[in-house]
Amino acid sequence: MLIETEATPNPLTRKYLPGRTVMATGSRDFPTASAAEASPLAHALFATGDVDGVFFGRDFISVSAKPAAAWEELEPDVLSILLDHFVTDAPLFAPGTAAGIAIDPNDDGAAMAVEEDPADADIVDQIKELIETRVRPAVAQDGGDIVYRGYAHGTLYLAMQGACSGCPSSAVTLKRGIEGLIKHYVPEVQNVEAV
């Protein structure tokens, strides 16, 4: 089995493509080791001691290293863990864990950043459609994801996950790329903020 490795714009994160589906629907972000307890794979990656975050996308896994870690030393361990997981067809999540349920990117259970005005429902629908069809596929190419967190008074709130979380260029991506696209198609949006 061959697992492709890709660099991401975030120098601390690598994207791994196993050549098969990782998450059939939604995505999963494990920003801490304690969040990874429901996934034997994510738990094993954190157990290396040098992993700072794990993200499961549709057909990829992003692994973020701690700032002091050296990828030259960490990558063989990561590849070994990933190969072992996929060669043995191990489950992605521990049996019986509710955390194994895939997360709908528009409803992952996290709190909204603001209370939305029901009068903005059409605007919110337009925003969510753009995020789903234009933004998320582009961000996934870099090993990350964007999650809607609310819209109020002209400001759109988004959470960045995977390789996008903590990436030095994420502010530029958010402001120049995502904000520009959303404002072009939904002129009611005046500002985009990360939460």
Predicted regions and their residues:
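Domain-level signature for proteins that mediate thiol-based redox and metal-cofactor handling
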Residues: 1-195
